[in-house]
Amino acid sequence: MMIRWKHRGGDIIFLMFTTLAAVSTASEHEHRTHMCSAEGNICSENAATVCRNNTCVSACSLRGMQECECDAEEDNYCYLCCGNSEHQCMAAHHHNILRPNGERWEREACSRCRMHGAELEGLPCDDTDSARLCIGGRCSNSVCHTKSPGSVCDRKMEKLCVDNTCENPCARYAPHLMVCDCPSIDQDTGFASEDRCQLCCYDFNLKPTNRRCQNAYRKYKIMDMFQKPIWRVGLECAGGKVCNKYGVCSSSHISFLVPFFSVILVSLISFI
């Protein structure tokens, strides 16, 4: 701010820089936010800080440790992780670092999943991340690491594993498109359908009688990260076969091996 003061025919200008005062005030405010009076109380839930000697410090420091990143993705997401040169970086409760009430430093979403895992199994555990599901009592986004590409990965059977992510790939085109299984037999030709082993979608906004399960690649150009159709690996197709990793309806690996083992068995019997 500038104040102009007229004096004896000349202007004596006093420049008062309020920005200096603002910086000083902000500094004092920041300093106050790191001060506390209730010893042992939580200063910030999000920052995982507690009051010690009238100062807000990291809960990890109570055991002489620093915040770090856990090896397990789920632990790193759900918990405060602590460690130092002598102790491995782990979830804080493994180092007996707990909240003042004895509970873990843990996200609420993860706590619900851990304590109510049976009823929440396969359901989204975090409203801010739809790909993160409650799996085995853990709030995880790695459910697809142990599943085949294109396989169902949620309890509502609305999402598939695509590029190691549990999602509704049809929604990439429009939110009202839903995942479906194209029929094994093509109704027009009466032969095995080539669409069965690929991602198919239907329009939820249409009346059930008007909904058609259609090939997502041809109809909507929905592809995987390699710009290829999304295969439904492991899905049962015509003739009791299964869809393979190339999007082809074929016999299972066991069926392929049966003739091979039969030849070996006959050879062994002949040799004996």
From Swiss-Prot:
Highest taxon, organism lineage: Eukaryota
Gene Ontology terms: cellular component: membrane
Chief place of localization: membrane
Membrane topology: Multi-pass membrane protein
Subcellular localization: Membrane
Transmembrane segments: 9-29, 252-272
Keywords: Membrane, Transmembrane, Transmembrane helix
Protein name per the record: Uncharacterized protein F15G9.5
Source organism: Caenorhabditis elegans
